Amino acid sequence: MEIKTFHGGVHPAEHKELSKESPLTQLLPKGELVYMTNQHIGKPASPVVKKGDRVLAGQIIAEAGGFVSANIVSSVSGTVKAVEPRKNASGGSAMAIVVENDGEYTLAEGVGVECDTNGLTGQEILSKVQKAGIVGMGGAGFPTHVKLTVKEPEKINFVIANGAECEPYITCDDKTLDRKSVV
């Protein structure tokens, strides 16, 4: 079957002015959350919790399955309802961890603690990024620790953050960079 293409793509109106001056707001999830173990590029993470376990916000619930993989961290506290195959976004099946949110948002030990990164080595920062399961927000969910791993690190003078938001209405990256950056 021939794949049809067209020149130029689709360029909807952006409407960024509707949200760019609004305050940043935290929306707390409610009810049941489903964490897919293949939500990032690379090897899926392996569940480290089982049905009935209590989990805390910030706790690792699935460990990275290799270098190009990422930990999955619970965003809520609650009880694991199931560890089972579920349909994923691409229509296939993947292992999922289902957590019933208790609404308390109890943090795991050491989570949410401010950290002065100026006193840390590059390897210590990399370890924190890897443990946290941080991935890119693009479609691939590329593990950030992979991007930050270099053979022989040199002194870093600048950090360039890609805050480009191509979707209509979306301004959260722009606002976060503008209001939360440390210079």
Task: Map each language-model feature to its residues.
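N-terminal, Lys/Arg-enriched amphipathic/low-complexity engagement segments
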Residues: 1-48
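Small beta-strand-rich domains/subdomains or short beta-sheet motifs embedded
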Residues: 71-73
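Short histidine-centered loop motifs in beta-beta connectors
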Residues: 45-54, 58
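Conserved small/polar residues in nucleotide/adenosyl-binding loops
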Residues: 182-183
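Conserved hydrophobic positions within beta-strands
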Residues: 78-80
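Acidic low-complexity segments
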Residues: 87-137, 141-142, 147, 151-153
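Gly-rich Lys/Arg/Thr-decorated short loops/hinges at beta-loop-alpha junctions or inter-strand turns
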Residues: 107, 136, 159-175
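Short hydrophobic beta/alpha edge segments that flank linear recognition/processing sites
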Residues: 56-69, 84-87, 94-101
